[in-house]
Amino acid sequence: MVAAWVAADAPHRLIALADDRVVGYVAVLNGVGWSSHVGELRLVVAPDFRQRGIGRLLAQRAVVEALELGVVKLVVDVVAGQDRLFDMFTKLGFEQEGRLRRHVRSTMGDTHDLLILSHFVDELAASLASPAAAADDDA
């Protein structure tokens, strides 16, 4: 598996490749105005490549990128019921800050709550650099 920055004109995006196939994507989008210190993390992993640690690795790399960009607070949206994704982000130190009721509509027309998670990047970067986090990565 190889991870590479997409292009010089999109420095806040990272992809994961397997045999020249894009199997994961993460982006850090900068906030504007009063929220210019906030970055939004977006993460997608191909269904057949989930549960392999790709999402966690991409999220960790996005945190490092956010820190380098000067982002203070990083937020991510998770659809309620995506328990594994929610658990992954909480293990990285994110906390739920809000819930938007019936905010997401599926292709089948069902509505779901949207959970808003956040973490201050400097705290998260310190936890990722800890010996305990390194031991988790070896598992």
Question: Residues of each region from the PLM?
Answer:
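Central antiparallel beta-sheet cores of small beta-barrel/beta-sandwich binding domains
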Residues: 12-13, 22-26, 63, 69, ...
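Conserved acetyl-CoA-binding loop-helix of GNAT-fold acetyltransferases
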Residues: 51-68, 87-91
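Short aromatic/hydrophobic contact patches that present stacked aromatics
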Residues: 42-44, 75-77, 116-118
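C-terminal "cap" of GNAT-fold acetyltransferases
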Residues: 39, 102-139
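Catalytic cores of nucleotide-enabled group-transfer and carboxylate-activating enzymes in metabolic
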Residues: 1, 67, 84, 96-104, ...
